[in-house]
Amino acid sequence: MADKLHFSLVSPARELFSGQVDHVIAPGTEGEFGVLVNHAPFMTTLKNGVVRVLEGDVVRHRFYVRGGFADVTPAGLTILAEEARNLSDASAQEIDVEVEAAKLKLLELDAGDTKRAVLEHQISYLEGLRSALAN
């Protein structure tokens, strides 16, 4: 399978994907990038966004990631995401509930509370995830 790229997507919670693919497109902090088999090695950071896994010209898997790192080596591409979800497993209703719960917690915190930044970051991630589901 020398004509395929080995791709792994890992979050702190679990490995979301590992397999041989044709092409991966990911949201780098310097811009979206694509990786094919035999790509030149590099490492970069990721921003929140959708990782698309292609077989031929068809997107077979979509994952929403919250930051992390992408490492391209001769062995393939590994993405270590701060948080990631398979978009085929996510539901808009569940995400809406999570957003509302986070917003309610945010209202309970004082303006100077350090937990506010964590909640605001989580709300931003969830809203991006919700937007990715709509597309």
Swiss-Prot record:
Keyword presence, Heme: no
GO cellular component, one term: proton-transporting ATP synthase complex
Places the protein is found: Cell inner membrane
Keywords carried by this UniProt record: ATP synthesis, Cell inner membrane, Cell membrane, CF(1), Hydrogen ion transport, Ion transport, Membrane, Transport
GO molecular function: ATP binding; proton-transporting ATP synthase activity, rotational mechanism
Topology in the lipid bilayer: Peripheral membrane protein
One family name in Pfam for this protein: ATP-synt_DE_N
Key word Cell inner membrane present: yes
Domain of life: Bacteria
Family to which this protein belongs: Belongs to the ATPase epsilon chain family.
Function: Produces ATP from ADP in the presence of a proton gradient across the membrane.
Assembly and interaction partners: F-type ATPases have 2 components, CF(1) - the catalytic core - and CF(0) - the membrane proton channel. CF(1) has five subunits: alpha(3), beta(3), gamma(1), delta(1), epsilon(1). CF(0) has three main subunits: a, b and c.
Protein name, per record: ATP synthase epsilon chain
Organism per entry: Hyphomonas neptunium (strain ATCC 15444)
